[in-house]
Amino acid sequence: MPLHDRIVGHFQASAQSKLDAADALAPRIEQGARLLVHSLAQGGKILACGNGGSAADAQHFASEMLNRFEQERPGLAALALTTDTSTLTSIANDYAYDQVFARQVKALGQPGDVLLAISTSGNSANVLQAVAAAHARSMQVIALTGRSGGGLAEQIDDGDVCICVPAESTARIQEIHLLTIHCLCDAVDSLLLGVEE
């Protein structure tokens, strides 16, 4: 296959995956946005975590909340647990890599806060540990995952939200995760700024 056609094929597959997932994910994304707004309105904060590309997504989300998305507004309390290399490496060295997010959640999380837990497979041990720590702190969880949802989907409690991308390709799941993050940011702004309803 010519390289040009291969590239165009990726664009087409990405667009089709997004269209195929839209109706299934929209209610979950709306539910997640309302959960975020409720927490923020009560003085809560959002902690976000993930590995690799999901770590980048966690940072992207936190930056959109702290700064702004597409509307002018005050900054919103959000923190990516993926950015402090001294903290991450000290926890990994002194305890275990699967504790790098959970120990931060235990230290920073408060009842009423929300954890945005991102894992393409749903099986990242450190993300699963973070969810357990969040539940122990009476926090709610928004799980952003794919495929069958893995162990992450199994950890969801009442009041949590699982946004599980119905795709098998890691690239397609990650692309839809980014779109989902943008949808969450837009929905939060719409709810806070009175654009919604």
UniProtKB/Swiss-Prot annotation:
Cell location: Cytoplasm
GO terms for biological process, alphabetical: carbohydrate metabolic process; D-glycero-D-manno-heptose 7-phosphate biosynthetic process
Record: residues binding Zn(2+): 60, 64, 174, 182
Chain positions recorded as substrate binding sites: 51-53, 64, 93-94, 119-121, 124, 174
InterPro entries the UniProt entry points to: GmhA/DiaA (IPR035461), Phosphoheptose_Isoase (IPR004515), SIS_dom (IPR001347), SIS_dom_sf (IPR046348), SIS_GmhA/DiaA_subfam (IPR050099)
Predominant subcellular localization, coarse grouping: cytoplasm
Gene3D superfamilies recorded: Glucose-6-phosphate isomerase like protein, domain 1 (3.40.50.10490)
A GO-annotated cellular component: cytoplasm
GO molecular function: carbohydrate derivative binding; D-sedoheptulose 7-phosphate isomerase activity; zinc ion binding
Keyword line: Carbohydrate metabolism, Cytoplasm, Isomerase, Metal-binding, Zinc
Broadest EC class assigned to this enzyme: isomerase
CDD domains, alphabetized: SIS_GmhA (cd05006)
E.C. designation(s): 5.3.1.28
Subunit structure: Homotetramer.
Note: The reaction produces a racemic mixture of D-glycero-alpha-D-manno-heptose 7-phosphate and D-glycero-beta-D-manno-heptose 7-phosphate.
Protein name: Phosphoheptose isomerase
Species assigned in the record: Thiobacillus denitrificans (strain ATCC 25259 / T1)
